[in-house]
């Protein structure tokens, strides 16, 4: 649900007659990976494309899919970094609105997200001992230390 989403949401978006190519954002994001500017906040007013942007970034970075053909018609495919980062990362996508109902209320959302993410990470990395910690930050740190993998949230 959270870890390594597929590209179906973005595929649906680009199939729309009104899609406007925003993949230049991926080129920018690629340029700040492994720099001190790597922390990016996708903040926009309501109904201005936050979910579409998140879907695009997930489709591009997630190991949970193969998105090369999906991105070929768009600006990012001409970037020198296009294939370097394409589908190379574990990605955690969090849709807070969807989690409110699943968590049975707004007051349980943070605990719900943390517990579900921890469970998915422990299942995905079951061949590593990730039992030393029960916090999401701790598990993310352990995954990185034991595998070298970077995780996009």
Q: Locations of the language-model features?
A:
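Phosphate-binding site recognition
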Residues: 1-153
């Amino acid at each position: 649900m959270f870890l390594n989403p597929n590209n179906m949401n973005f595929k649906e978006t680009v199939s729309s007659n009104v899609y406007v190519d925003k993949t230049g954002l991926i080129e920018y994001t690629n340029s700040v990976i492994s720099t001190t500017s790597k922390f990016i906040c996708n903040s926009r007013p309501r109904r201005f494309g936050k979910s579409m942007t998140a879907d695009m970034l997930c489709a591009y970075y997630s190991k949970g899919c193969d998105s090369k053909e999906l991105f070929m018609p768009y600006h990012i495919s001409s970037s020198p970094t296009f294939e370097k980062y394409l589908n190379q990362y574990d990605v955690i996508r969090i849709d807070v609105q969807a989690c409110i109902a699943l968590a049975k209320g707004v007051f349980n959302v943070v605990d719900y997200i943390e517990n579900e993410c921890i469970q998915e990470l422990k299942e995905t990395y079951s061949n590593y001992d990730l039992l030393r910690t029960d916090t999401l930050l701790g598990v993310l740190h352990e995954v990185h230390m034991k595998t070298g993998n970077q995780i996009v949230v």
